[in-house]
């Protein structure tokens, strides 16, 4: 089974939403896929028509990220996960390293989200979060070079 942990997923519109949906659907060719995503209007209708197993996390943003991390921890402890894919450093930030060591983990990065001056609290949070992933995947050569420059 594959786990997709994302803040961006249809029915919300956008490039990242399309990317994460495409990745999830492509992984279906290799085994079952469980998606943990934010809840949006019309999500129930989308989920019913999808071949993916989608679990929506809702609630106040401040609490939602911790509830989501706890739910992912519980799921990964109870299931054999071949690989976990995270759409953003914030999606992996609150996942315990001990849980991530049970599988292969991939985290996508985007230049806008990592472009924080060296040594700032945000830069340190990004680096700490990305260090948890086995593989960090840049969405462009520019992003890759920026990431190398920023730590």
Question: Which ranges hold each PLM region?
Answer:
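Extreme N-terminal starter segment of soluble prokaryotic enzymes
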Residues: 1-3
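N-terminal strand-loop element at the rim of the active site
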Residues: 6-13, 19-64, 143, 148
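A short, histidine- and acid-enriched strand-loop-helix "catalytic/donor-clamping" loop
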Residues: 12, 63, 92-93, 105-120, ...
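Short, well-structured alpha-helical segments in soluble
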Residues: 70-79
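Structural alpha-helical scaffold elements that stabilize or flank donor/cofactor-binding regions
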Residues: 77, 128-129
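Structural motif
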Residues: 82-83, 135
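Short His-centered aromatic/hydrophobic patch
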Residues: 86-92
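A short, active-site helix/loop in glycosyltransferases that binds the activated sugar's phosphate group
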Residues: 133-151
